[in-house]
UniProtKB/Swiss-Prot annotation:
Catalytic activity: a ubiquinone + NADH + 5 H(+)(in) = a ubiquinol + NAD(+) + 4 H(+)(out)
GO cellular component: mitochondrial inner membrane; respiratory chain complex I
Membrane topology: Multi-pass membrane protein
Top-level taxonomic group: Eukaryota
Species of provenance: Danio rerio (Zebrafish)
Entry keyword Transmembrane helix: yes
DNA repair listed as a keyword: no
Name the UniProt record assigns to this protein: NADH-ubiquinone oxidoreductase chain 1
Amino acid sequence: MLDILTSHLINPLAYAVPVLIAVAFLTLVERKVLGYMQLRKGPNVMGPRGLLQSVADGVKLFIKEPIRPSMASPILFLTAPVLALILAMMLWAPMPMPYPVLDLNLGILFIMAISSLAVYSILGSGWASNSKYALIGALRAVAQTISYEVSLGLILLSAVIFSGGYTLQTFNTTQEDTWLLLPLWPLAIMWFISTLAETNRAPFDLTEGESELVSGFNVEYAAGPFALFFLAEYSNILLMNTHSTVLFLGASFTPDAPELMTISIATKTAMLSILFLWMRASYPRFRYDQLMHLIWKNFLPITLVLVLWHIALPIALAGLPPQT
C-alpha cells in the first residue's frame, strides 16, 4: 500500500509542486527583468522587493468568480485549461533530474507526442469561447505549433543519431566529454528559435497579438481557468529549456552526488529562460507570413539536409579500417 502511494501520488507531486513554484517565480522574474530592461522597477510592493507578487496574483485569480460567456460551450470551455495543465505536467515525467518519474525507453518521442496534444487544448478553448478573436488566435496557435514541430522533430532526429538512443539519459553519457552544442551548433540555434515559436513566446507571440486579437485564444477566460492556461504556458517554457539543456548543454550525471546534476540543470535552464525574456524585451513581433517563411523555406530545408548528412556520413565511413 505504501509503495503504491509513493509511486502513484508522492513521487508525481514531488515533481509537480516544485515545477509550479518555479513557474510562479518565473513570472515574477519576467516582470522584474522586463522592468529593468525598460528602465523601471517592476513589481516592488508585495513583500520584500516584490517577492510575493506572484503569490498575491495566484490568490487573486483563484478567489475570483470564473465568468463563462453565455454562448460558450460549457464543458469544453472548462475542460480545455485543465487539459492544458495536465499535459504540461505530464511532459516532466521522463525528464532526468537526475532520476525520472517514468523511465521510458522512448522518452524523447513521449515528449514530442504529448507536446503535440497540447494543440487540442488551445483549439478547444478558442472554439468553445464562441468568439471570433479567440478562434483566430487558436487557429494561428495551431498552425504555428504544428509547423515548428516539424523542425523540432528533425533536429531531435539528428541529436538522436549523435547520441545513439531515444532515452534522455543516453544524452548524459554522450556529453561526458563534449557538449553536443559544439558539433550541432547550427541545429542548436534553430532548436532555440523553434522552442520560442513552439511556446508562443515573443517575437513569435502572434496568438496573443494584443493590437489585433485582444489576448488571443484565452480572451474570454478569467480567474481560475485563465490561471491554469498561464501555469501551463510557463511550465512549457521551463520544460523546453530543460529539454534544451539535456540535449545540448550536457547535464553531467555523477552517481555519488546526484544533487549536483539537479543544480547544473536548474542553472542552465534559468539562463536559457532569461534568454527567452531578453528576446521578448529586444525584438518586435514577426509578421505571420515571415513566421511561416522562416520555418518552411529556411529551417525545414536546412534541417533535412543536416539529417541526411548525419545519416550518410557514418554509413560512408563505416567501410574504413580502424584508424590507429
